[in-house]
Amino acid sequence: MLKSNNTSEATTRKVGDKTAKKVFFRRRKGCPLSVPNAPVIDYKNPELLIKFVSEGGRMLPSRITNVCAKKQRKLNNAIKIARILALLPFVFQAK
């Protein structure tokens, strides 16, 4: 039987002769649209909606914008409605 000592390997990794420190992950910030005094998600507010659209015109995912799932669905629907009503372009111009 092979015995392995994984307890010391889990805490630190050896890189060459030096030992690397533990990797700490950044704490995710909360939803920017769920804080008090946050702007209301509405298709009639293209200034807000354009912040959640990429340069190519695609909707940004919630892992990039840090928006919660409920607000992400509202954002997606508002962006789609704004595009249909010609408040937002479907495709942005390449510069």
Swiss-Prot record:
UniProt keyword list = Ribonucleoprotein, Ribosomal protein, RNA-binding, rRNA-binding
* Disulfide bridge partners, by residue number: none
Bilayer-crossing residues are none
For this chain, one GO molecular function annotation is:
small ribosomal subunit rRNA binding
Q: What GO terms describe the biological role, i.e. biological process, of this protein?
A: translation
GO cellular-component terms in the record? cytosolic small ribosomal subunit
Its function, per the record, reads:
Binds as a heterodimer with protein bS6 to the central domain of the 16S rRNA, where it helps stabilize the platform of the 30S subunit.
Stored NCBIfam families? S18
What family is reported?
Belongs to the bacterial ribosomal protein bS18 family.
* Subunit description: Part of the 30S ribosomal subunit. Forms a tight heterodimer with protein bS6.
What is the name of the protein in this document? Small ribosomal subunit protein bS18
The gene is rpsR
